[in-house]
Amino acid sequence: MDFKSKIRTVDDFPKPGISFKDITTLLKDGEAFHAAIETMAAHFEPLGINMVTGPEARGYIFASALAFRLRAGFVPIRKPGKLPWKTRSISYQLEYGEDRLEVHEDAFQPGQKVLVVDDLLATGGTIRATIDLVESLGAKVVGVAVLIELSDLGGRKRLEGHDVISLVQF
């Protein structure tokens, strides 16, 4: 399937000079959404994934569907202050500033095979932080799946050593 044709580009959103990739057009197409999940699942199914995780918020869309398809658990990676129990957190750099991600400290177990999923790979900061957070709890990230990769931003380089697939490159 031509996934790229299912994604709308909105120029100058959310600010001038940004070319936003709107995934809602793919998500509302049941066949395209199904095909995206099946394509990702086919790549990682042989690895025996135990757990799928993704960062808030759009990462949840693909990560939870993929976890269901792989018969694996799903762990949400949250923004600070959203989880009710003891957490492990990690800070990471943004272009202008810093952000944090959190997860319950009992979310992952040593030896679990984890797949990290997000909608978009740009600079790789969020996904790198997610990998580091998961692995700080003893689990092993065995792959990364994204719908869209903005290739010119070089995010894949920050994920070296991991099996990374993207269904669409811009």
Curated annotation (Swiss-Prot):
The keyword Oxidoreductase does not apply. It catalyses: AMP + diphosphate = 5-phospho-alpha-D-ribose 1-diphosphate + adenine. GO terms for molecular function: adenine binding; adenine phosphoribosyltransferase activity; AMP binding. It is an enzyme of class 2 (transferase). Pathway: Purine metabolism; AMP biosynthesis via salvage pathway; AMP from adenine: step 1/1. It is found in: Cytoplasm. The keyword Transferase applies. Keywords: Cytoplasm, Glycosyltransferase, Purine salvage, Transferase. GO terms for cellular component: cytoplasm. GO terms for biological process: adenine salvage; AMP salvage; purine ribonucleoside salvage. Belongs to the purine/pyrimidine phosphoribosyltransferase family. PANTHER family: ADENINE PHOSPHORIBOSYLTRANSFERASE (PTHR32315:SF3). Homodimer. This is Adenine phosphoribosyltransferase. It comes from Symbiobacterium thermophilum (strain DSM 24528 / JCM 14929 / IAM 14863 / T). The gene is apt.
